[in-house]
Amino acid sequence: PEESMKKRLATLTAPFICLDGMNEKGVSIAVLTLDSEPVHQDTGKPVITTTLAIRLVLDRAATTQEAVELLRQYDMFASSGRDYHFYITDATGDGRVIEYDCESEARELVAMPINAITNFYGLYKEKVLPDQRNGIYGHGRERYDAVSDVFEQQSGNYTDDTVWAALIAASQEPNPESITS
């Protein structure tokens, strides 16, 4: 009976613990870990956690802009002891990375147009060198550069093969000691 209760609880909570997804309007969201301290905003707005923010976007946003407007209504509390940023895109191709500025004491939300991101602050891309960790600014620049090269070669004429090539370019070998692997 105890095992059955655990399974029931897991089934009930699963919709609220998503990490990536796409809704019926074509809005997709992905969460990526960062190397900075977890954001814990405290401006007096209602507080939302990482996984609930994803659920909010998937349930209520029809565009990337709507997703940004929704997230701006909340103070972010990064869950699981990690910091994160979100990549959101919609059916029109409006892609943005949503970051909580690691150089700002208030950790303001910044929504920056970008066509790809990995595990570093897009806001501080110039401070991130490839093939190394870059303190609070993150890592994975080499994977971002590889994806950007794939996109540049296609000049905006993206096909399924382009997407597959970008995914392969961004892939990394599994590492049991890394949460981002």
Predicted regions and their residues:
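Extended, Lys/Arg-enriched charged tracts that mediate electrostatic binding to polyanionic substrates
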Residues: 68
